[in-house]
């Protein structure tokens, strides 16, 4: 019998206990289930999140504009560099006047028309992130200093796009490729297809 080994990374919320269920199913439809209980160790403390502040992302009409973000280090990339480093790309910005989504932040795995970002649908690695809109003051956002808080705020499955963005909008998100939780806030929006957006991101290390 072949042995299957898989590393799994879990993010603990502030709940005292959580039950995680694993289901393993083979090609014949046979399955086995394993449940584990994860308890919160309050003595372990929390972890400081990482901040990427004042990131400027260009819309798709800006020549050689940097529309893509790697959440591993906050680097911004243009379309060509992003296409050459697909596995590193987690977020992107564009202006959508087709579906009336206008200023939008999504991930490569979202459904984005090829007329907006050429070639994206043909990427072999299209990481996904999901987003939940939050109501939060600027002071509260900039005071975030807890990874547990970031995990707690993403309490349900989010949407594939953060759309119709306005200054002050705040979103909780999950980087599904790396199983990391974070939040971003919109600080500035300029223009449309030839414009840009300025955001700050706080994320689990």
Label every PLM stretch briefly.
Residues 1-7, 11-19, 29-205:
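Surface-exposed, beta-sheet-biased, low-hydrophobicity segments with strongly acidic/polar composition
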Residues 24-26:
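Conserved structural position at the C-terminal beta-strand
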């Amino acid at each position: 019998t072949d042995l299957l080994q898989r590393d799994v990374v879990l993010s603990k919320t502030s709940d005292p206990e959580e039950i995680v269920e694993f289901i393993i199913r083979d090609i014949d439809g046979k399955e086995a289930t394993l449940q584990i209980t994860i308890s919160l160790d309050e003595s372990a403390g929390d972890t400081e999140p990482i901040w990427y502040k004042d990131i400027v992302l260009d819309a798709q009409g800006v020549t050689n504009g940097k529309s893509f973000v790697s959440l591993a280090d906050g680097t911004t990339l243009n379309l060509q560099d992003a296409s050459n480093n697909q596995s590193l790309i987690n977020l992107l910005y564009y202006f959508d006047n087709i579906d009336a989504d206008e200023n939008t932040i999504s991930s490569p795995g979202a459904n984005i028309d090829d007329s907006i970002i050429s070639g994206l649908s043909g990427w072999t690695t299209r990481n996904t992130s999901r987003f939940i809109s939050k109501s939060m003051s600027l002071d509260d956002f900039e005071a975030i200093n807890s990874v547990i808080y970031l995990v707690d705020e993403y309490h349900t499955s989010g949407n594939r796009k953060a759309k119709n963005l306005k200054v002050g909008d705040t979103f909780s998100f999950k980087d599904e490729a790396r199983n990391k939780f974070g939040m971003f806030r919109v600080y500035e929006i300029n223009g449309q297809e030839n414009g840009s957006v300025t955001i700050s991101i706080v994320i689990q290390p």
